[in-house]
């Protein structure tokens, strides 16, 4: 998997940062895909500067209904429809996202020519496509807001073909059953348990993508042990009280969460427009002082998971 940041500003766009949107590129050899997390104003325009377009999107996850995370959605849906893409799309989000989509399409005389499914979520598992699971966590914000934890299922370990050949099993259809961990019966009556010839399973990758939030109990469960945590750092440590009062987090609080959750890497985003490049570097330094494995996202930054 890899993350492509389309917008990294909080509240309003700046000359160098658009409002929130993140692509998750699912780099699977047989079932690749592209998911979008939040869709602030101008998201479809930002996508024009990437290798992806709205027609490739399979799922969109909205954290909450504040405009800087949502106002780009109607235009993106309409453009996807005008392009003649017939592939289905599912939108996940809090209560009200269905009404928002229906109302904006109706009042603007717009529609979608592709199957559009809208799922209003609550805390808990919301998706398992056989390759990965998505769990929603309710966060602390003035509006109903969620963070999404995406975890790939573990991959089976490699089959020890050399040991199987030594046991008299020739490559062929039986290998597929053995690779699945099944027990097969050979022509001579012997039974071979595939699990005995498999290397340990390879742990799937995981990412936690937070919506806007002040520190809350659910945050630790959402982030616990993930390879990558994407979290807002709206304000610096000196403005922590102001951040929390508005349902946001400071640099210090975000980095402390990353450390306590034992994540592999923290990616900072949702930066207040008050910070210029020098100010952003100060935010990054504040996080790294607590959690060194921290990166600052810019628009069009790409990070592997």
From Swiss-Prot:
Binding positions (Zn(2+) 2): 68-69, 212, 270
4Fe-4S is among the record's keywords: no
Name of the featured protein: Ribonuclease BN
Active site: 68
Residues engaged in binding Zn(2+) 1: 64, 66, 141, 212
Membership in a protein family: Belongs to the RNase Z family. RNase BN subfamily.
EC category: hydrolase
Any one GO MF annotation of this record: 3'-tRNA processing endoribonuclease activity
Organism name: Salmonella enteritidis PT4 (strain P125109)
Cofactor names: Zn(2+)
Quaternary state and interactors: Homodimer.
Keyword annotations: Endonuclease, Exonuclease, Hydrolase, Metal-binding, Nuclease, tRNA processing, Zinc
Known EC number: 3.1.-.-
